[in-house]
Amino acid sequence: MPFDTPPSVEQVIVTAARLPPAAAEAAFSAVHLSESDLAKSQRVDEAVGQVPGVSLFRRTSSLSANPTTQGISLRAIAPSGAGRTLVTLDGVPLNDPFGGWVIWSQLAPESLTGIDIVRGAGAGPYGAGALTGVIGLKERDAGIAADVSVGNLGSERASAAAVSTLGRFEFFGAASYDKSDGYVPVRGPAQGAADTRTDLEAKSISGRVDMATGLGLLSLRGGFFEEDRGAGLAGARANASGNVFSATLVQAPRGAALGWKLQAWRRTSDLFNSSVAVAADRSSTTPANSQDKTPATGWGLNGALRQKLGGVEWELGADARLNDGEERERYSYMAGAYTRNRVTGGKTSVVGAYADGSWTTGPWLVAGGLRLDHWETTDGFRVERNALTGAVLLDQRPADRDGEVVSGRLGVTRDLGQDTTARIAGYTGFRPASLNELYRPFRVGNDVTEANAGLKPERLQGLEAGVSRKGDKGLIEATAFWNRIEDPIVNVTLGAGPGTFPIGGFIPAGGVLRQRQNAGTIDAIGLEGRAERKVGAVTLSSALSATDARVDGGSDAPQLTGKRPAQAPIWSATAGLSAELSEKLTLASDLTWEGKRFEDDLNSRVLDPAWRLDARLDWRVRPLVTAYVAGDNLLDANIQTSRTADGVAGYSAPRIVRVGLRLAI
């Protein structure tokens, strides 16, 4: 599928509450997904997953991924359930205040006008969380889009978004509903009565009012979402919900006049997540723990000043993010009842300031930025009680911690003529541990992972160089990069069941005990490239990502030295074709291939290489209405997503075929 280059940095017209693209962004590795790119996907994470090296923690989309594994990472350096990428909607972070993951069902592709993906640590205006890059979503500011479809596996989907103008007011509204009966992840002889469907029901609604004022454009936005899903095991389910409110005031820079932005937001979320232990023959499950509630609240403020004077553009800004949350859980299931209760949580905050700018002279663009951030982890606690008597069994109050991080970026781009550009860039970034990583232990089947309140922020250093050429009939570009993550947060294996451990308690046969730890460093070298060519009515596209990431566990985790990070493939590639078969008929297809992954930190559980073919046929029945038939994993390939300690593999969705109607105005 073709991707656009980032929007022209000279664009200054603002029809939504966001500053125009900064000139500095052209010096870094960026991909833009247009509205037409998004129209082919049912879910936002599937749309961004078209870019090689961009993926959720596992090889599953949000159709079947547990909320706690919907974190997204770029470049396959070290995928994480919490995600190592900052995801924003017009500047407001979408990352969950408790876990750092993103509940992708809160937004439908129809509600967006485009997505900008910037790979490499996001210093400058982005700050904490943008360790491997930034995914910037842009909400629709014109037109109407609606989509209705049905398919096998009980798939039903309806989504609509519209913008209307009345005087100096602009109104935006969006709603979506997505339902699936799901599929059973475990297949073949290994499947037992314990294995059930990953059913899904998700809904969201959002609205926005933009108003022109004497100070600038004022935007008020609110949104709500909820999803309920099965985890593929009898008795294991998850329910995630939340809402967000934001206020933004923007004055776009015009000519040499000063532009600025002020933004405030508040996000709340909650998560129910139940886990089970699986019998050795997979004939049954037993309740293991019930994470009944995870109430969390995130607040944020940011502001920026920007001005362009000739070839110089500068921006000064500051931002603050505060998260407060806890988990309430029942666990230790014995004799038909949970015997222990646990409440754990705390607060995190990051406050930072930055200076960012660029200088354009002739064929040269020089861009750079510097940030200073102060992070804090405070008021942490973990209290465990006897469920029957209320007696306190454990009361931990880890000491408050804080620190400062300086990060920056520098990039140089030169126009070589004949539509060819070369660039080089360096950057640093950091990501503090989420409340989930600090305080919440979790269980998947028979595998238990313990929390760690002493986790330090992850830090990344990187260098990259690239060259690109774009013409009327196509483009080609390539980037080579080196990244190092210091103190990466890794799920480190401590032992295997059956057995009882000082932390984690009893681990059954076929399970392992892990703990989140800062494990040395991860070094990654890689190459990413893409090409596109238009031949008459046919557009051919391809993309490649090769990332060799290796762990050096040092003295803390020497058993990891030389291993690849869990869920990090070396190779991934896509090939796409889009053809206008007639004035009304269009065919699009994408072939995706990925090399093997490892399920675990010790690289003992191998996930085989995987490929899938997707295709879609569109027929324009009216000027504004399109009927389509689409197939995901059209050849029904077996795509491994997980593997247990006793060798049982889980798989991604089988073939899904759907038919639908789309309205676009």
Question: What are these regions, as identified by a protein language model?
Answer:
Residues 10-41, 66-71:
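N-terminal periplasmic "start-of-domain" segments of outer-membrane beta-barrel proteins
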Residues 45-92, 96:
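Extracytoplasmic beta-strand/coil segments of soluble accessory domains associated
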Residues 92-119:
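Short acidic/polar hinge/loop motifs at secondary-structure boundaries
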Residues 123-124, 136, 143-145, 149, ...:
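Periplasmic-side early beta-strands and strand-to-turn transitions of outer-membrane beta-barrels
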Residues 180-186, 196-202, 215-260, 268-296, ...:
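Flexible loop and strand-edge segments within Gram-negative outer membrane beta-barrel domains
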Residues 198, 290, 294, 298-304, ...:
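Outer membrane beta-barrel strand-and-loop segments of large Gram-negative receptors
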Residues 268-272, 324-333, 376-392, 400, ...:
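Surface-exposed extracellular loop regions of Gram-negative outer-membrane beta-barrel proteins
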Residues 360-366, 374, 475-476, 481-485, ...:
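Gram-negative outer-membrane beta-barrel transporters
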